[in-house]
Amino acid sequence: MPADGYVGALDIGTSSVRALLFDTGAGQVPDVEVHLPYQPRVAADGTYETDAGRLFRLVGSAVDALLQEAGPRRRSRIRAMGVSTFWHGLVGADAGGKALTPLYLWADTRSWRESDELRRTLDPDAVHQRTGCLLHPTYWPAKLLWLKRGEPVLWRRRPRWLSFWDLVHQHLFGRAVTGVSMASGTGLLDLADCGWDGELLRLLEVGEEQLPELGESGQGLARQFAVRWPDLRNVPWVCAAGDGALANLGSNCVDPTQRALTVGTSGALRVLYRGMPKRVPEGLWCYRLDRDRVVVGGALSNGGNLYAWLTRTLAVELPRLEARLRRYRPVSTGLTFVPLLAGERSPGFASHATGSIAGLTQATTAADIVRAGLEATAIEFARVDQRLDQVLPGARRLVANGAGLLASPAWMQIMADAIGRPVAESKAREASSRGAAIFAAEHLGVLDGDKLRTEVGRTYRTAAAAHAAYRLQTARQEELYRLLIHDRALDAGDAILNVRPATGETK
């Protein structure tokens, strides 16, 4: 352990809160690890939310457990706290930090009509290039317009609009402060000047005073928490950064030569680097890690959640599934799967999208459907990878993270074959947590994340014949997408959905 002590890391996800301890060289302390699960509320109308107060109490319990597991000697040497959390969460709060609404998570799609209206009212490409975000239910503009319409009494109170960590920061330090990373995931931040976007605020009739203050860290815990956590009383808590950006930092994918492939509940493929893209590629997004580094990529709404749905719904025997999946030749199930059960983000951002399977027969087995679903998800990642090449060509490999993906050699090989690049296993199994620790250590000035080595395990190479088969299957999958989603939207007179057809052109 370096003499400099330790860094605590919180990882607040949409299904659990984790707390880990790292030394200031980003090495994980193996006997200190807290995992507290929770379940968001999900409903068929697009609801995807949780209770902010309950989640805050869970975060407090995670810190309690972290300090207990660390023990007196180690917890007294914690020099900073780093935080990774989900982008795009939105909660309304009063001046004292009391939540007035549920915490709306990224997958809540109830504002799809408002996102469509914003695309009619605004110049979608101009907004995309300014903010790095698309006009879609994922982001705050659509959710705020939806709340303005649906909650007029609340709206007239002019509440504060915060991400979850901004609310936590207010409770811990007395002020709602957000970092540019979390702000960049709202869809309201101008990426170039790192300030709130005036055009969007005027349209939504939201004042800057209703948004969190932009800052970097908090220090000096409020009395209640200073008594509860005396070892952290004067320790700096670095403002939370987006889990995706920190996953890149934590797996040492910090330049355009390496792309981070993450499959959690959802999925993402990202590039982290210093600078700004000349143009954000169509169908992708650009957020910030800090004022110097951006992360460009695409997020899939369907990743580990799709795999979980398949295995649960089809009642597959998991111990035998992996061996069966490995026996398939690429694209041999006879199925074409549009894997959009949780809607679509990148690259089409069709807020109304649903999943479909074509080619089912009486001979189709449960394993066939699972294999087709994994192949279809890999094809979606390949589509994102191709768009990244438009602005950041030359990636030599992908570094993969996510427990479900890393546990399945069959899925890893499918990824390598479909995307057409080597895919290496990341040895940083808790990449976002490690990224939070690195980010905090950078804040202390004791570590440079750019200089850390990428630790990888097995690398899966692309088989040329398999890649050719996936290229053909990509065309079939895009055609089914066009027929079922893009053309259906146009037939309904809803051309403003901004869905991309197979050619990648906007109609």
Features from the language model and the residues they span:
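Conserved phosphate-binding loops in N-terminal lobes of ATP-dependent enzymes
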Residues: 18, 62-80, 144-145, 159-169
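N-terminal phosphate-binding loop and adjacent alpha-helix
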Residues: 33-75
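Gly/Ser/Thr-rich active-site cleft segment
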Residues: 12-14, 127-244, 307, 342, ...
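Phosphate/pyrophosphate-binding loops at sites that engage ATP/ADP/AMP, CoA/4′-phosphopantetheine
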Residues: 59-79, 150-155, 198-208, 384-396
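A polyampholytic, Gly/Pro-enriched intrinsically disordered region
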Residues: 55, 120-136, 231-236, 258-260, ...
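Glycine/Thr-rich phosphate-binding loops that ligate phosphate moieties of nucleotide
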Residues: 1-33, 79-121, 153, 271-282, ...
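ATP-dependent carbohydrate kinase catalytic cores
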Residues: 187-291, 319, 323, 406-410, ...
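Active-site nucleophile and cofactor-binding loops and adjacent substrate-binding regions
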Residues: 50, 80-85, 104-107, 131-139, ...
